[in-house]
Amino acid sequence: GDSHMQSGYFPGTARSSLQKYFGNAGRGLVFPLRTAGTNQPDDYRISSSGGLSRNNSARGICGYALNTNSSPTLEITTNNFFNTDNSFNKISVISSKPGLSASVKQSPSSTIDLYWRDYRSCSVTWDKPLTNVNLSLSGEPSTLYGLMLERTQPGLLYHSAGINGAGFYTLLDSPHLFDQIGILNPDLIIISLGTNDAQGRYRNDQFSSNLNKFMQLLRKGNPDTPVLFTLPPDSNKQGKHNSDLGKLEKTLVDYAKNNNCAWWTLSEVMGGKGSVGKWRTEQMASKDLLHYTPKGYMLQGYLFYQAIIKSYKKYSENNDPKD
């Protein structure tokens, strides 16, 4: 997703709500975003001893990348900002080959390496879930693409990654991002883009072309994974309602219908055209009438959770649970 997702309030609320229903298998993807010079969700903190620098030419599964110049130690701390247990007893480190080895002081612990195309995923597991761990990285200079925090118990993993300013068009030159999705082995891919595509000078034919190129890159490594589009929230452009959002929504829905994808029309759930103004009145939208406040994003995340559960229950009532 874009900045609506990077702030963490929408996906954090959806994640915690879904995990209360399906079980908690962990926080999922995290990244030292502040070390990369950008904002980070509130439910975790990662600090570094040094030896990391931003890689501006690569964009991995978390939307950003860091070069390792020595053997850094990361202090990873999680909290219950979204009223969910974010303790973990497994960390996976996703990096470029030859890759990074990972170790923690917890004992006993075990390490497993997975090699996927041009990447290495090194996982460390220990017994008791914790909320604070010092992770030591070693190996030849590599690119760090992501970290994954898990609990070794049944439940749901809801990974999220947002990139400020991202649109379908900005990610077409990000092969690492698309390649690394396979490491997660997802059961569902949720795409939350479109706001930035509809800003500036919008051309529907160009957007349609970018959308198709984006999906070709995604489908190359994930040909059969179900895809769900969350359509952009209502917003303004140049001081008035962004009328291009309707054109973009139609193009996305037409694509979804023709390619067996699902979609969720957030702007409709919010109240339709011009609803961003009403959300601003309730202190749920920012002054720019483009972004939303934490309160607004958290409500959107909860509405998304409700839509997922409603569809899940409807499906379960009409199908054999074994299917």
Question: Positions of the model-derived regions?
Answer:
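Extended, alpha-helix-rich binding/interface surfaces that flank or overlap catalytic cores
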Residues: 2
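Conserved SGNH/GDSL esterase-like catalytic core that processes O-acyl groups on lipids
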Residues: 6-107, 113-209, 244, 291
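Solvent-exposed, polar/charged alpha-helical surfaces in well-ordered, non-transmembrane soluble domains
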Residues: 8, 12, 16, 175, ...
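Sec/Tat-exported extracytoplasmic proteins
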Residues: 17-22, 193, 215-225, 259-260, ...
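Conserved beta-strand termini and adjacent loop/short-helix elements that scaffold enzyme active sites
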Residues: 32, 161, 230, 266-269
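Loop/turn elements at helix/coil->beta-strand transitions in domains of secreted/extracellular proteins
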Residues: 154-157, 184-189, 222-227, 258-262
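Active-site segments of SGNH/GDSL-like serine hydrolases
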Residues: 190-196, 216-250, 265
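Catalytic His-Asp segment of secreted/periplasmic serine-dependent ester chemistry enzymes
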Residues: 235-323
